[in-house]
Amino acid sequence: MSDPKPTRSQGDLAEMLEMLLDKGVVVNADIAVSVGDTELLGIELRAAIASFETAAEYGLEFPTGTDMERVESAANISPDQSDPASETQSETESTNPLSDDSTPTASTSAEETK
């Protein structure tokens, strides 16, 4: 009898990771721990996973200290395209497939912050 062989190659994982970072994905998770009818613990998780280049294209928020010039040059976008204050809410909603109503993004307009 022959030894079992893996059905997946390492290339599959690399390709999947490349696609995930290239396209991006939003993770929404609601976790509740209950005993009977009493909820003891509730966790709401909202996360966007994407490469810096993809996140810059869609206007997602970056951590403090991120070298924005490097991100903008890697994503081939101009600084005014990545500035969230320069976008309107309608432009953001129509061009941002990574976000939904419950997912926070950096693309807030000046009208939203007032």
Curated annotation (Swiss-Prot):
Residues 78-87 are annotated as: Alpha helix 3. GO terms for molecular function: structural molecule activity. Residues 99-114 have a biased composition (Low complexity). Residues 95-105 are annotated as: Alpha helix 4. Changing residue 19 to E: Makes no gas vesicles, decreased interaction with GvpL. Proteins GvpF to GvpM might be involved in nucleating gas vesicle formation. Mutagenesis of residues 13-61 shows that almost none of them can be substituted and still make gas vesicles. A minor component of the gas vesicle. Gas vesicles are hollow, gas filled proteinaceous nanostructures found in several microbial planktonic microorganisms. They allow positioning of halobacteria at the optimal depth for growth in the poorly aerated, shallow brine pools of their habitat. Expression of a 9.5 kb p-vac DNA fragment containing 2 divergently transcribed regions (gvpD-gvpE-gvpF-gvpG-gvpH-gvpI-gvpJ-gvpK-gvpL-gvpM and gvpA-gvpC-gvpN-gvpO) allows H.volcanii to produce gas vesicles. All site-directed mutagenesis is tested in H.volcanii. A minimal gas vesicle can be made in H.volcanii by gvpA1-gvpO1 plus gvpF1-gvpG1-gvpJ1-gvpK1-gvpL1-gvpM1; lack of enough GvpJ1 prevents formation. A similar region restores gas vesicle production in H.halobium without the p-vac locus, but it still has the c-vac locus. Modeled by homology to GvpA to have 4 alpha helices and 2 beta-sheets. Extensive mutagenesis shows that most mutations in the N-terminal region (homologous to GvpA) do not make gas vesicles. A short motif conserved in GvpJ1/2 and GvpM1/2 (but not GvpA), which is predicted to be on the outer surface of the proteins, is important for the function of GvpJ and GvpM. GvpF to GvpM interact with each other in vitro, and may form multi-subunit complex(es). Interacts with GvpA1. This is Gas vesicle protein J1.
